[in-house]
C-alpha cells in the first residue's frame, strides 16, 4: 500500500510517496507559511499534496507539536503561532480524500530509526536537537506516545533550575538551553543575532563564546541522556536534528556522557534516515507496523 507521508516542521513542509518497502518517491518541499495561520497552512498543504494524492491509499503526517485527537497542540504555543488547535487530521482528510493518521514528528522519527537498528534492540530512545529538542521512546518494541501524546517530549525536562524561561512556561528546560534557538538566545556581543548554524561555523573558527555555547548544549544533552538511561534503561540512543547532526557535535555529547558514572553510559549513534525519518516513521505507523 502506498502512503502519502507529510512532515510538518517549523520552517518547511515535506511530502513524498512511500511504498510498503519504504522506498521514497516524488519527494516535494515547500516553506512553512511564515504567517502560521490556518488558512495559509491549509493552502500550502493543498499545494503540496495535490500532485501526489491520486497515487496514495492513505495519508500519514509527522508534525511538530502534540497531536491530540487529530488536533495540533503544543507545550510551547509560540512554536505554532496561530496554528494552535488546528484540525490537522480533518484538514488532510478533506484535502486528500483519504484516511489520515497524525503523530508527533520526533515520535515518528524514533519509530523509523528503531527499525534501522539490529533485531536484538528492544529499547531505544531517539533525540532530535534542532530549533527545539524533542524525542521518542521505544520500550519493549513499542512506541510510547501516551494518552495525551506527550511521551518523549524530553526537551522539557529540567536542565538548570536557574536557567532561562522556556516557552512552555517552565524554567531551565533542556530545550531552552541546548536547542538551536536556546543557543542563539544566549549569544552575546559580536554573536548577538546569530543563528545556530552561524554559531557552529564560528565555533569551528575557534571563537571562544561560540565554542562555549556549542559545548554547553552538548553537555546539557549528555546529562539528559544520563537521566533517560536511568528512566528507561534503553539499549541505545540515536541523535538527529540539524544541531544533533552538526559536525563534531555527537562526539562532544559522547565525551560528556563518558564523564557521568558508568551505569548511565549508553551507546550513541547518529540518525540513519536524517531528514526523512519523520516521513518514514509516519508511513510505518499508518501501514499498521506497531509491533
Curated annotation (Swiss-Prot):
The keyword ATP-binding applies. GO terms for molecular function: ATP binding; N-acylmannosamine kinase activity; zinc ion binding. Pfam families: ROK. ATP binds at residues 5-12, 132-139. It comes from the Bacteria. Belongs to the ROK (NagC/XylR) family. NanK subfamily. This is N-acetylmannosamine kinase. It comes from Salmonella gallinarum (strain 287/91 / NCTC 13346).
Amino acid at each position: 500500500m502506498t502512503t502519502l507521508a507529510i512532515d510538518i516542521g517549523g520552517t518547511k513542509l515535506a511530502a513524498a510517496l512511500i511504498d510498503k518497502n519504504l522506498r521514497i518517491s516524488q519527494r516535494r518541499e515547500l516553506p512553512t507559511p511564515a504567517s502560521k495561520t490556518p488558512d495559509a497552512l491549509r493552502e500550502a498543504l493543498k499545494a503540496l499534496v495535490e500532485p501526489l494524492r491520486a497515487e496514495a491509499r492513505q495519508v500519514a503526517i509527522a508534525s511538530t507539536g502534540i497531536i491530540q485527537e487529530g488536533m495540533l497542540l503544543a507545550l510551547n504555543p509560540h512554536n505554532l503561532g496561530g496554528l494552535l488547535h488546528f484540525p490537522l487530521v480533518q484538514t488532510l482528510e478533506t484535502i486528500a480524500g483519504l484516511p489520515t493518521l497524525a503523530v508527533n514528528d520526533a515520535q515518528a522519527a524514533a519509530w523509523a530509526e528503531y527499525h534501522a537498528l539490529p533485531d536484538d534492540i528492544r529499547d531505544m530512545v531517539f533525540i532530535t536537537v534542532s530549533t527545539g529538542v524533542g524525542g521518542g521512546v521505544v520500550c519493549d518494541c513499542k512506541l510510547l506516545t501516551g494518552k495525551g501524546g506527550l511521551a518523549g517530549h524530553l526537551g522539557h525536562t529540567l536542565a538548570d533550575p536557574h536557567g532561562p524561561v522556556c516557552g512552555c512556561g517552565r524554567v531551565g528546560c533542556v530545550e531552552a538551553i541546548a536547542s538551536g534557538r536556546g543557543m542563539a538566545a544566549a549569544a552575546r556581543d559580536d554573536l548577538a543575532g546569530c543563528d545556530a548554524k552561524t554559531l557552529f561555523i564560528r565555533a569551528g573558527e575557534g571563537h571562544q563564546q561560540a565554542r562555549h555555547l556549542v559545548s554547553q548544549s552538548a553537555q546539557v544533552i549528555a546529562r539528559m541522556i544520563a537521566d533517560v538511561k536511568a528512566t528507561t534503561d534503553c539499549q541505545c540512543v540515536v541523535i538527529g536534528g540539524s544541531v544533533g547532526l552538526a559536525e563534531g557535535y555527537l562526539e562532544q555529547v559522547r565525551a560528556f556522557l563518558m564523564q557521568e558514572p558508568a551505569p548511565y553510559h549508553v551507546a550513541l549513534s547518529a540518525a540513519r534516515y536524517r531528514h526523512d525519518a519523520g516521513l518514514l516513521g509516519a508511513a510505518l505507523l499508518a501501514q499498521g507496523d506497531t509491533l
